[in-house]
């Protein structure tokens, strides 16, 4: 069947972006975040195409199990740890690293007798007030983990709340609190996310890039291209109809757009049922034949309409929704008053994925 919407993933771009991470943090190991199905890019495909990545991070056990079943053998950290003893046993069998953030998790693990050591990170809450132990508990936690022969300590984590903003006072407070809590304690440290890497906030033993790995900028005041990143996802659809609409007639649900003059409009096969946000306003750009055109009328479940005045388009033409050099995902996210993360992760099952430069094709 001919796809209505295609997400084309350039795996070479992701490899390039990993190399860019290494250039920005040359003394750190890289734990690439591939949670939420690789930020919507396909976690298995991403992992298989980063054979030199030091480790990967996912959000939950289910994501880790899927990767192990696909043959991904690199170190794999579960950022939320485990929810039950059964999950802990499964994690041990799959040789996973668990990020432990709460007393109840430690108590759960202390009751187990694993066949081989459980690999644990300890997370400290230094400012997000989301997951993590209070920093003043670090020394007690360190001794407690060291006393367990069946545990292998991987290191310490925290997460920066405001690494993407120009004013770095919050980040500096978090870094100072993390350093003070760990003074005199051993173990590798992991702090920086993509924004932290770009802003050179904390080049610790490990960095954890996420968004920048996929070629989107993690900071609002610098473009991905300016950071040397390459977009990995290009989303496109097709023009499925062309209509001539007289002056004074309205377009779409709610009649929110009225033609100020006779208009030629194009109907594009994409809508909020595919992950194109309903919140996008009139004028949101798309590209047809290299021309930048504006959306008119409300987003429907399956379709949008665009003004074809500036383009001699034809039915069947490809429509770029985001991911070209001139139409990065950040622009669409800004128009929708959301984040690039949400768009990348929000494509639905109706979108067909196509992969370019897959290392498995050249093996």
Model-derived segments and spans:
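Active-site-proximal beta-alpha core segment in soluble small-molecule metabolic enzymes
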Residues: 5-8, 13-16, 28-190
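Conserved PLP-enzyme active-site core in the AAT-like
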Residues: 24
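Active-site anion/phosphate-binding pocket segments in diverse small-molecule metabolic enzymes
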Residues: 2-15, 19, 37, 63, ...
């Amino acid at each position: 069947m001919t796809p209505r919407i295609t997400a084309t993933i350039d795996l070479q771009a992701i490899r390039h972006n990993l190399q860019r991470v290494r250039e920005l943090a040359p003394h750190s190991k890289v734990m690439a975040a591939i949670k939420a199905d690789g930020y919507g890019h396909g976690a298995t495909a991403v992992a298989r195409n980063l054979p030199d990545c030091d480790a990967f991070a996912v959000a939950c056990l289910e994501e880790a199990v899927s990767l192990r079943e696909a043959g991904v053998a690199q170190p794999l950290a579960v950022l939320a740890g485990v929810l039950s003893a059964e999950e802990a046993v499964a994690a041990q069998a799959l040789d996973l690293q668990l990020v432990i953030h709460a007393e109840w998790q430690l108590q759960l693990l202390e009751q187990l007798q694993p066949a081989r050591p459980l690999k644990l990170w300890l997370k400290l809450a230094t400012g997000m007030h989301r997951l993590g132990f209070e920093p003043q508990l670090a020394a007690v936690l360190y001794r407690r983990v060291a006393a367990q022969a069946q545990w292998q300590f991987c290191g310490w984590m925290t997460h920066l709340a405001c690494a993407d903003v120009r004013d770095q006072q919050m980040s500096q407070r978090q870094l100072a609190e993390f350093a003070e809590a760990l003074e005199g304690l051993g173990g590798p440290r992991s702090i920086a996310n993509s924004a932290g890497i770009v802003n050179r906030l904390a080049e610790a033993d490990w960095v954890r890039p996420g968004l920048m790995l996929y070629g989107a900028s993690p900071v609002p005041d610098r473009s991905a291209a300016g950071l040397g990143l390459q977009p990995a996802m290009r989303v496109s659809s097709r023009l499925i109809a062309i209509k001539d609409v007289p002056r004074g007639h309205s377009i779409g649900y709610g009649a929110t757009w009225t033609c100020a003059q006779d208009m030629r409009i194009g109907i594009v096969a994409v809508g909020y049922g595919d992950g194109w946000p309903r919140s996008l306003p009139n004028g949101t750009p798309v590209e047809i034949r290299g021309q930048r055109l504006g959306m008119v009328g409300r987003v429907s479940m399956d379709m949008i309409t665009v003004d074809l005045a500036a383009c001699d388009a034809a039915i069947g033409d490809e429509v770029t929704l985001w991911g070209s050099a001139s139409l990065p995902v950040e622009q669409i996210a800004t128009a929708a008053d959301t984040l690039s993360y949400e768009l990348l992760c929000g494509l639905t099952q109706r979108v067909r994925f196509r992969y370019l430069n897959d290392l498995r094709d050249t093996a």
